[in-house]
Amino acid sequence: MNTNTPAHPPEGAPLSEATQAALASAEHAPDSPGATHIRSFVHRRGHITQRQRDALEQLMGKWSVPYAPRPLDMAATFGRQAPTILEIGFGMGETTEKIALARPGDNFLGVEVFNAGVGSLLHRIEESAIANLRIVQHDAVEVVRDMIAPDSLAGVHVYFPDPWPKKRHHKRRLLQPPFVALLASRLAPGGYLHCATDWEDYAVQMLEVLGGEPLLRNTADGYAPRPDFRPQTKFETRGLRLGHGVWDLMFKRA
């Protein structure tokens, strides 16, 4: 689950200057003068483990792609032509790792802003030798807008984004009509947008927003069953056992 809890190196154990420069694009304050939209995340000081720090230091150049305001050449990035799936907000990367390993014929591009999650997934990629997975550490809206070519994606995953439960913060929710329209434009015809949330109010909003996008059609009558390719997380399993709901939505590009 992506709880949007940021992670910065604790005092007294900084990353190298080179690594700090590589991570700089993801470390801007939310709604800064350089931002062109309301950000769906807020940075606070948080914990990062030594293993995550080592992965950031040693593996960013191997498995990550730096943000750049131009379309990404997917074939060059992955070293092959294959359907590309974009995963937005992968948290600590457990689900992303499992899906990428189970679908070796697809390329996966994960987007996350927080150092702990990026470091965690970098370690997973290296440890499991996941050749079909890359990371961009940057704001997802800007990545989709600037780095993803129109009509190019086979799928998009948005799993458990921050629900921003207070009404005054709903404007920070990621899945707003302008961003959904942008995502739809980046899907190839027949490509899918799969979202999941454990916050009912957000599920209702997602269904309304996705249902209102002309380029998308719902593959279910309302909410969809969890597809086999999305593993059930430990957090989700515990929540279901306690009677909490989880809502999946599956839409396809018309």
Curated annotation (Swiss-Prot):
One of its GO terms (molecular function) is tRNA (guanine(46)-N7)-methyltransferase activity. The keyword Isomerase does not apply. It catalyses: guanosine(46) in tRNA + S-adenosyl-L-methionine = N(7)-methylguanosine(46) in tRNA + S-adenosyl-L-homocysteine. Substrate binds at residues 166, 198, 233-236. Keywords: Methyltransferase, S-adenosyl-L-methionine, Transferase, tRNA processing. Disulfide bonds: none annotated. Pathway: tRNA modification; N(7)-methylguanine-tRNA biosynthesis. Its EC number is 2.1.1.33. PROSITE patterns: SAM_MT_TRMB. S-adenosyl-L-methionine binds at residues 87, 112, 139, 162. Signal peptide: none annotated. GO terms for cellular component: tRNA methyltransferase complex. InterPro entries: SAM-dependent_MTases_sf, tRNA_(Gua-N-7)_MeTrfase_Trmb, tRNA_methyltr_TrmB_bact. Residues 1-34 are annotated as: Disordered. The active site is at residue 162. Catalyzes the formation of N(7)-methylguanine at position 46 (m7G46) in tRNA. Belongs to the class I-like SAM-binding methyltransferase superfamily. TrmB family. This is tRNA (guanine-N(7)-)-methyltransferase. It comes from Bordetella parapertussis (strain 12822 / ATCC BAA-587 / NCTC 13253).
